[in-house]
């Protein structure tokens, strides 16, 4: 049986893609009323604006009303995934090659559960990170969560835009 988050993902992802957005994360919290949090990013690398979030929110709201997946009243929150966005799909790692990432693992790897480094490559369900002076190979299935890191280099690029 799929979780409510998976069900919501299934019914909204294609529409968001058609609008030029990547569905980054769906989270349902609370009881009465439930809060449906949705994080989006731009497929073309541009910044997500308030108008983008409003457009996406209207579309998602209409779909959720038709699909009737959530039984009681709920609040819908649509936001940009942000500069330190979560990496929740394997494909995300290839999109953000050479970017700094923080990774938390489900279990120990080389005596550690946390790694931070630059993504070198992602292939065959493995993530290759450059951590300080060594390369670390992480099986994607071991990753509990991962987020991009806002570095000085990224910040400077943003200022130039």
Curated annotation (Swiss-Prot):
Q: Which UniProt keywords apply?
A: Cytoplasm, Ribosome biogenesis
> Which top-level group of life is the source organism from?
Bacteria
A single GO cellular-component term from the record reads: cytosol
Q: Name one GO biological process term.
A: ribosomal small subunit assembly
Family matches, as Pfam families: DUF150_C, RimP_N
Q: Which CDD domains match?
A: YlxS_C
The disulfide bonds in this chain are: none
State the family it belongs to: Belongs to the RimP family.
What HAMAP family does its record include? Answer: RimP
This chain's function reads: Required for maturation of 30S ribosomal subunits.
NCBIfam families associated with the record: PRK00092.4-3 (NF000937)
Q: What is this protein called?
A: Ribosome maturation factor RimP
| Organism, as annotated | Rickettsia massiliae (strain Mtu5)
